[in-house]
């Protein structure tokens, strides 16, 4: 009986090691809570999904500088064991500033600019 438990434990450890070995690059979406109007308060959102492993850095930037008062959702996972997180902050859109989301993951470092037309 003890040998069966040993085999089960070894099998579970192999499965955990296999899941840890999977790397999936994040998908990044940058958008506002409501349609953007210059001079009107809004929220800038960066939704990052489908990444593994869970270690990730997500920053919201205005003209290359980190934005203040950023809030982060809890790190959550999907049925396929990839992770997702929402990062957001209040802001006032205008035509002169560049807003972007910068993501650093072991699979990629990438910045996605907010496109007010999408």
UniProtKB/Swiss-Prot annotation:
Looking up Pfam families in the UniProt record yields:
C1-set (PF07654)
List the disulfide bonds in this chain.
Answer: 46-101
Instruction: List the PROSITE patterns.
Output: IG_LIKE, IG_MHC
- GO process annotations (BP): antigen processing and presentation of peptide antigen via MHC class I
- Enumerate the spans annotated as Ig-like C1-type domain: 26-113
In the UniProt record, does the keyword Manganese occur?
no
Q: What are the subcellular locations of this protein?
A: Secreted
The reply to whether Secreted figures as a keyword in the UniProt entry is yes
Q: Which GO terms describe its cellular component?
A: extracellular region; MHC class I protein complex
Domain of life here?
Eukaryota
Segment forming the signal sequence:
1-21
Q: State the UniProt keywords alphabetically.
A: Disulfide bond, Immunity, Immunoglobulin domain, MHC I, Secreted, Signal
Subunit structure, per the record? Heterodimer of an alpha chain and a beta chain. Beta-2-microglobulin is the beta-chain of major histocompatibility complex class I molecules.
The UniProt function text for this chain reads: Component of the class I major histocompatibility complex (MHC). Involved in the presentation of peptide antigens to the immune system.
The entry assigns this protein to a family as follows: Belongs to the beta-2-microglobulin family.
Question: What name appears for this protein in its UniProt entry?
Answer: Beta-2-microglobulin
Gene coding for it: B2M
